[in-house]
Amino acid sequence: MERHKLQYEVLNHHNPNGETGQHWEVEVHASPEELQTFTEMGYLVREGLFQGEALQKLRDALDRLEEREWEKRDNAIAGKKGWGFIPRHLMDKDEVFLDLLKFQPTLSIARAMMGPLVRLRGLSARITYPGDGREHQTPWHQHMRVISNPIPPWFSRPHCIDCLIYLDDLNEDTGAVAVVPGSHDWLDKASPTIHEPVEGEVHLQVKAGSGVLIHGNLWHRGLPTLNAKRRMLILSYTPTWLRKSPHGGAQPKDGLTHAFLEDADLEERMLLGVGGYS
């Protein structure tokens, strides 16, 4: 995997010791050409982000969480919706997930695309199940549905990078992910709420441990999970001045990040939404 370095200076000279930091050096886990492709297409495939023991640790942690939250899981399955079971606040629930806070293969790309001042919007999972009598796929959707029409002169376009990390192979049994390249730049229309194919869509099948990084407003959908359970993580980044994801309600009062923040450094605090504003 090709890498290159970026250096940023945050123009905050009146407060050089403030919560933004002033000088940042980022070793980006991607080539400039790959970043340009990401800019234009709205998605970037990263093969083999996790392999061997690292992949198994994530699978085991998610399986443990699925069993602990079995009531929510069973309700999601009974609801017969194609979204499956979506546990939230994963970094508060297992050290294995908290270890992803500074995962450079994705974090460095987020900083290359959005600047050094980024935070975690959240870490969630989505588990879909085969079976009769329910929907097995998701409709077309976007994750940052806040664009108004017409666009105001000083409208702040929302940017978000969602890293879809697949813990199982994507194939015809588990369901591939479909995307529409370039649709993240379509500010004049929203994604349709249908399951059917649309013009220009691309189907992506990757091996377990791989990731598909998408702009939060890229049109995408999950194809049917027909014969085997599909597990995925959703690791999301935004600029520090965007709030964290509202989905999933309040974080657990006994969550792991509370104690972690007591001794966290500037970067860790920023990633968890404390600091990075001025």
Predicted regions and their residues:
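Non-heme Fe(II)/2-oxoglutarate
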Residues: 2-25, 211, 218-278
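A structural signal for short, well-ordered beta-strand segments
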Residues: 123-125, 163-165, 233-237
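Non-heme Fe(II)-dependent double-stranded beta-helix
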Residues: 2-41, 47-148
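Active-site rim elements
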Residues: 94-99, 199-201, 220-223
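Catalytic core of non-heme Fe(II) oxygenases with the double-stranded beta-helix
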Residues: 131-205, 244-248
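Short, solvent-exposed loop/turn segments at secondary-structure junctions
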Residues: 50-52, 125-130, 145, 170-172, ...
